[in-house]
Amino acid sequence: MRQENVTTYVRFRGDLSFKDSPFNEIDALIFTLLSYIDFKGIASYEGSITLREASEKVIALESGDPIEGHRKSAPHELELLDLAGHSKRFGDTEITYFVDELDKKEVRQFCAMHFVFERNKSFVAFRGTDDTLVGWKENFQMLYAKNVAGQIRAAEYLSETCKNDLKHLFVKYYVGGHSKGGNLAIYGVLHCDESAIKKMVKIYSFDGPGFEQPFEEMPRYQEIKDKLMTYTPKFSAFGFCLDHVRLDHTVDSFNNGLYQHDGYSWIVDGTHFKDAVRDEESKRVEANFKEWVHSIPIDHRESFVNALFDVLEESGCNSVSDFLNLNMSGVITVIKNMINIPSEERDLIIHIILFIINEDRKSKQTVDSRIVEKVENFKENLALENLKNVFNTKTDKTEKAKS
């Protein structure tokens, strides 16, 4: 029997207004998940549109032929959007201050919006990492950079939109995000205008990565520590990257392993998440990941990240989907490009690919069938088990030719 999740929550509690049943942690996760929907051309910064109207426009748009530049939603994303958009609880929520920016030069993937769910109450949602390589490169930059472009933009965005002027005098703000979005929410609150912080009620991070700097050493921690709520599934690798903020709530999930990062798999019990105990295997993965990261000097991490994404971009990939869908010709291009990388950096790239694929094998259960198919196709083409032998053979030949 399938456990209840955010979708069943809306299905069975969507007829209750926020006056009937006050805003809770499940509502917060729902808004962060809705921020992954591509509202470009539908929502705007200056104007507003109800979630009901926006849902109808997105569904109509995605029912036709694919549109270049528009990210098509997964079936479960559209289901949540449709249910929420036509519910009493969420339908009249207004989307405003919508921004969606992708800057390859600055390595910034940033999307944020306000969900005004009651008069004078707004949830500020930061989107997590999308399918773009720009977004993933920005994630990897967190391994060595004090801050990344998206974090700086998050602070600017909160200062711009969480105003304390006469028009917004009585507005209270809830801020949050899933995955990288949770990290952006926390960083943004810590670095935005002081006047904006005073208007914030809660800050939510749903399996968001931490920071290189210990969180308690950051300025303003004392101001926000009682407002901050962090949630991680019982198997969490993402939420414990670097120095994790803190562990407030461990959530049960009906997925396995790394796929518990998917907020749609989190088990809901009424107006709360079902509690769980952190998985021992998750602790092992965290320890291995941190050991691997700490083994790389900070000054080498940047060159490693640049080398990794240069290889992917030179193969013609702009997204993770492009990478997973590479045909044999594309795979050969990747291998050829990697041969020219210094052996130390090349070994690190192989290590992280093997690590992710290995965890994928152990974790696969109830996930989007399209993702499973893409991963299987890529593994079949790349033949990762033989990858090191391929590199070693080709490198030996290259060295002999040089001598």
Predicted segments with their positions:
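Gly/Ala-rich beta-loop-alpha elbow adjacent to hydrolase catalytic centers
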Residues: G176-G181, A185
